[in-house]
From Swiss-Prot:
UniProt-annotated stretches for the region Head domain (RuvB-H): 259-342
Native source organism of the sequence: Anaeromyxobacter sp. (strain Fw109-5)
Cellular component, GO annotation: cytoplasm; Holliday junction resolvase complex
UniProt-recorded name of the protein: Holliday junction branch migration complex subunit RuvB
Binding partners and assembly: Homohexamer. Forms an RuvA(8)-RuvB(12)-Holliday junction (HJ) complex. HJ DNA is sandwiched between 2 RuvA tetramers; dsDNA enters through RuvA and exits via RuvB. An RuvB hexamer assembles on each DNA strand where it exits the tetramer. Each RuvB hexamer is contacted by two RuvA subunits (via domain III) on 2 adjacent RuvB subunits; this complex drives branch migration. In the full resolvosome a probable DNA-RuvA(4)-RuvB(12)-RuvC(2) complex forms which resolves the HJ.
Length: 342
């Protein structure tokens, strides 16, 4: 079996990171950096629900991975003074898995379902009456003799997190009274996140080092923390233990992360579109085959950053390389290449 190398600039969570993320996770709204309007809204929602002694309305958090959706769920539970029960869409295989979680909830508890867009149809359907009427229907028997037994549930809050809102069925999406989308972070916010994390790790940080790390973290706190970990290793072994600009630059050079935050696979994707397919338009399946990746991985992990930074465009005819892609890879743009997005 061939193991793929760990990708330091992947926004998705990687094996073994959960414990560190928990230790660095903000504990309160005051500690949460970025997403100011969203955080202020949740501060009001949580305070009002707690004052009334009610469960918070169901919440849907959407946005790219690594932006703090799980951290928000933890903070909400702490602010409300209730327990947080964590699971994920792929982990809920059958209705019984969901029943076990729902019946264990105390009044006003929060059930957090990550990747909620990956729920099976059967589990999703069973969730509807639980969200609306706080009941779970159990079917006893089969065929014409089947009977439905209704199990009453405590009033709870479902917090769903998704990176792909478009994959949610409308009946599920419409059952969330509170829907908020997290956006990418500014370099100044990522710098503050990196400095706070370094303080918890007892790592001295030079302001220029934190600024350089934040600039290349692709607008994503999870990536900033991951790069900070790797830079800490280089600071300890090849420096004096301080995170300086030179140490950060050395770290990212060794990880093949360039000045725009692109890694080797990002550059390979751009090179394929430019060199193999003449800059496009080219279908995503052709690109996936050329770089040896799954289509879904390209669409969910790699493309969002390349599109956001203006290297690629998604068009009805396929992917098209934009002028910054030619410039970044040092390619001459073919004469007469208009880069039409139509």
């Amino acid at each position: 079996m061939t193991l793929k190398p760990v990708r330091e600039v992947s926004p998705g969570s990687q094996e073994g990171e959960e414990r560190l993320e928990q230790s660095l996770r903000p504990a309160t709204f005051e500690e949460y950096v970025g997403q100011e309007k969203l955080v202020e809204n949740f501060r009001v929602y949580a305070k009002a629900a707690r004052a009334r002694g009610e469960a918070l309305d169901h919440v849907l958090l959407s946005g790219p991975p690594g932006l703090g959706k799980t951290s928000l769920a933890h903070i909400l539970a702490r602010e409300l003074g209730v327990a947080l029960h964590v699971t994920s869409g792929p982990a809920l295989v059958k209705k019984g898995d969901l029943a076990g979680l729902l019946t264990a909830l105390a009044p006003r508890d929060i059930l957090f379902i990550d990747e909620i867009h990956r729920l099976s149809p059967a589990v999703e359907e069973a969730l509807y009456p639980a969200m609306e009427d706080y009941r779970f229907d159990v079917v006893l028997g089969a065929g014409l003799g089947a009977q439905t037994m209704e199990m009453k549930l405590e009033r709870f809050t479902l917090v769903g997190a998704t990176t792909r809102t478009g994959l949610l069925a409308s009946p599920l999406r419409d059952r969330f009274p509170i829907q908020e989308r997290l956006g990418y972070y500014e370099p100044t916010e990522l710098r503050e996140i990196a400095v706070r994390a370094a303080r918890k790790l007892a790592l001295p940080v030079d302001p220029a080092g934190a600024e350089e790390l934040a600039r290349r973290a692709r607008g994503t706190p999870r990536i900033a923390i991951r790069l900070l970990q790797r830079a800490r290793d280089f600071a300890q072994v090849e420096g004096d233990g301080t995170l300086t600009r030179e140490i950060v630059e050395t770290t990212l050079e060794r990880l093949e992360v360039d000045g725009r935050g692109l890694d080797a696979m990002d550059r390979r994707i751009l090179a394929v579109v430019l060199d193999t397919f003449g800059g496009g338009p080219v279908g995503i399946d052709a690109v996936a085959a050329a770089v040896g990746e799954e289509r879904d991985t390209l669409e969910d992990v790699y493309e969002p950053f390349l599109v956001r930074e203006g290297f690629l465009a998604r068009t009805p005819r396929g992917r098209v390389a934009l002028p910054p892609a030619y410039a970044h890879l040092g390619r001459e743009r073919p004469q007469g290449k208009q880069g039409s997005l139509i």
